[in-house]
Amino acid sequence: MEQKKLMFHCENIGMQFPGTLALQGVDLDIYEGEIVGLVGENGAGKSTLLKIILGMQTPTYGSMLMHGERYAPQNPKEANRQGVGMVFQEQSLITNLTVGQNIFFGEEKRFAAGPLINYQAMYREAQAVLDTVGLKDVKPGKKVSDLDFATRQMVEIAKVLQGVTNHKNGKSLILLDEPTSVLN
């Protein structure tokens, strides 16, 4: 039997806010291919832990490893470069942009053809990501404002998947903070 490889490890993670201990001594191992759920009451620290893993908050104490290397992202962009992304319950899509522009927001230089953006190439790559999440009928050139709420949330998931796929270790960790609570 093949032994699963450890992808993510956190040890003794703690988070203290003024007057509040949000997390205390959290240990967590996530192996490649594994699906892990964090269950607890409101205020138990689940979202705080996810924000620490994504680099949105710095733990008061503890350490993390990703693919066996020290992991301490300072922001979500740095976490993405190391293969970690997060889909939030609240949507962050820019409604006056197209689906493809949202999926590749901040990465437009990849599609630059001189001073112009090659939207055809961008939309081709965006369609491949949309297909992956079951949105074959959603066209990358469509305005986000024309999508229903549930489809927008699936575009959020596609955006995160696209953002974490090009890193050195090839395996990604996708964090989900109640992203499907609004879906059909």
Where on the chain are the PLM-derived regions?
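Glycine-rich phosphate-binding loops of nucleotide-dependent enzymes
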Residues: 2-184
